[in-house]
Structure formats: structure tokens, C-alpha cells
A protein has these predicted regions:
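Alpha-helical transmembrane segments and immediately membrane-proximal extracytoplasmic
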Residues: 1-308
């Protein structure tokens, strides 16, 4: 009888252990499902912010190009030059107040995801990055859309992680999801953006990170497709290769070497100019005149070459 009671108590413990273990597994699944749902929300918000950023860049580019293509009288260039200079002074003031909004955006995002730096005021910095990027582009400076879009997405991920009180270990995944959503909003390519984020920004192939980044990218890409039904990258003609694959390999290798050398030369030249620019002993608003002047001259030369 005692043996039977011991066996019954042991069986009760086993059932309780299975129940607790099963509940623990379901709890983990619910936490993962919540993370995936929140990542989709991050993608939606990122699309609603990054897509207007892309649209305004597109609109201001054509507006500026139309102005120079119309060949206005010389006196119209004076107020535009002064306006561009004032914009650059204001943007430099913003960067002085919030240094993280300066630069391309991808190195800053990588630093935040890796825990080296933090966003203290993500909403204010996101608005400043948005406004500063639009104004700088309208002033004629050469700015890409992928880097700022990535950083804007990481700002959204940081904000949502604070609003939803997400677990500390999952904040990094929301930052990566926001970065991927920003890239997907810029190019309407969710799968490519997820791979780029995992490879060059997050650099960690956790399944959760891949899933959250892909979900956020799909939602942001859907928002971008609604605003821009015709993706300009889809208009690129694809031609069938003439040579065999093994014959093409040597050309691919040669192209890789040429692109690597040119890219390294461009990067080294940019860094050299940065050091020279930093050594100029003049106030920032005076040095900005040189930047605006160079951008203005390039715009004039480009219009004249197109007109010819």
C-alpha cells in the first residue's frame, strides 16, 4: 500500500512538472508572438515616416533640377544661394546639439544595436534627422536615402521598445527590425533589406532577428508600394548573358577588383578632405559657404552639360 501511495505521489509530481513545463513553453511562444506583432507595428510606423522622407527627397530633387533647367536670370541665384547657406547653418546647429543625427546613419545604427551608444531622445532626434536630411538635400548636398532611412527606422524601433516595455534582450531585435524596415521603405525590397541588416548592421544570425526584420520589412515595403506603385528599380532591363558562366567569372573578378580599388580611393579621398576641412581655422558658418558654393557650381555644370 505504501508503495502504491509513493507511486501515485510520484506520478502527480510528474504531471505537475509537465504542466509547468508546458505552460513555460506556451509562455515563451506568446512572448515570441508578441515580439513578432510589435515588429510588424515597427514596420508600419517606419514606413509612415521613411516613405514621406523618400517622397520629399524625390520632390525636392525635381524641384531643384527644374529651377536650374529653366535657366533663370542671374539675380535669382543670389537669394537661392543665401537660402541654401542658411539651411546648412541651421543643419550644422542641429548636428551640434544632437551629434548622432550627423553622418550617413548606418554607422550610428550599428553602434546603437551593438550597445556602444544609446538614443537619449529618440523622438526629437528622429524629427531632427528627418528635417535635417530634407533641408540638406534641398540645399544641394549629396545625401543618400538608404542611410537616413535606416537610422529613422532604428529610432522608431527604439521608441516602440520604450512604449511597449519590451524585454531588455529583445530591444536589440526591434532596433534591427526598424533598420530593415527603413531600408525596405527606401527600396521596396524587404528580403534584400533583411539580408543587408543581418550581414552589415546586426551581424548576428539569430532566427528571431531574421524573422522580426523580415516582418517589419514586408510591412514597410507594402507602405512604400502604396505610395510608389512603380518601383524605378523594376524598370532596369535584364539581359540574358552572352558568355558561359565560367567565362563570365573572370570578368566578375576583374570588375570586383576595379570596384574595390575605386571604392577605397573614394573613401580615402573623402577622409582626407574631412581632415583638411576640419583644419580650416574659420567659423563653421564661414566654412559652410564653401560647401554650398561647390554644390551650387556642380548643379550649374550638370544643367549646362545636360542642356548641351
Amino acid at each position: 500500500m505504501e508503495l502504491w501511495d509513493k507511486a501515485e505521489r510520484l506520478w502527480t509530481r510528474v504531471k505537475n512538472w509537465k504542466t509547468v513545463r508546458g505552460w513555460h513553453i506556451w509562455k515563451l511562444k506568446l512572448v515570441d508572438a508578441r515580439l513578432y506583432f510589435v515588429s510588424m507595428f515597427v514596420g508600419l510606423l517606419t514606413g509612415l515616416v521613411a516613405v514621406p522622407y523618400h517622397y520629399l527627397l524625390y520632390y525636392l530633387f525635381h524641384l531643384r533640377s527644374g529651377f536650374f533647367a529653366s535657366h533663370p536670370a542671374w539675380y535669382w541665384h543670389i537669394p537661392l544661394f543665401l537660402f541654401s547657406w542658411g539651411i546648412l547653418v541651421f543643419v550644422m546647429w542641429l548636428v551640434g546639439k544632437m551629434p548622432l543625427i550627423g553622418g550617413g546613419g548606418i554607422p550610428q545604427t550599428r553602434g546603437v544595436i551593438n550597445g556602444r551608444i544609446t538614443y537619449r531622445h529618440p523622438f526629437i532626434e528622429m524629427v531632427s534627422k528627418f528635417v535635417g536630411g530634407i533641408l540638406s538635400f534641398s540645399a544641394g548636398l549629396s545625401l543618400g536615402r538608404e542611410g537616413p532611412s535606416v537610422q529613422i527606422g532604428s529610432y522608431v524601433g527604439s521608441l516602440v521598445s520604450r512604449w511597449t516595455h519590451i524585454l531588455k534582450g529583445e530591444q536589440k531585435q526591434l532596433l534591427a527590425a526598424g533598420a530593415g524596415a527603413g531600408l525596405a521603405a527606401a527600396f521596396a525590397a524587404p528580403l534584400a533589406s533583411s539580408l543587408i541588416v543581418i550581414e552589415s548592421i546586426e551581424r548576428f544570425d539569430a532566427p528571431k532577428t531574421a524573422i522580426t526584420t523580415l516582418l517589419a520589412g514586408v510591412v514597410a515595403g507594402a507602405v512604400a508600394s502604396m505610395v510608389f506603385p512603380v518601383n524605378p528599380y523594376h524598370l532596369i532591363e535584364v539581359t540574358e548573358p552572352v558568355f558561359a558562366f565560367f567565362v563570365q567569372m573572370k570578368y566578375f573578378l576583374i570588375l570586383a577588383v576595379i570596384v574595390s580599388v575605386c571604392g577605397k580611393f573614394y573613401s580615402s579621398t573623402m577622409n582626407a578632405f574631412r581632415h583638411v576641412y576640419a583644419k580650416v581655422n574659420s567659423p563653421a558658418y564661414v566654412k559652410n559657404v564653401l560647401s554650398v558654393l561647390v554644390a551650387y557650381i556642380i548643379s550649374l555644370m550638370q544643367v549646362k552639360s545636360d542642356w548641351r
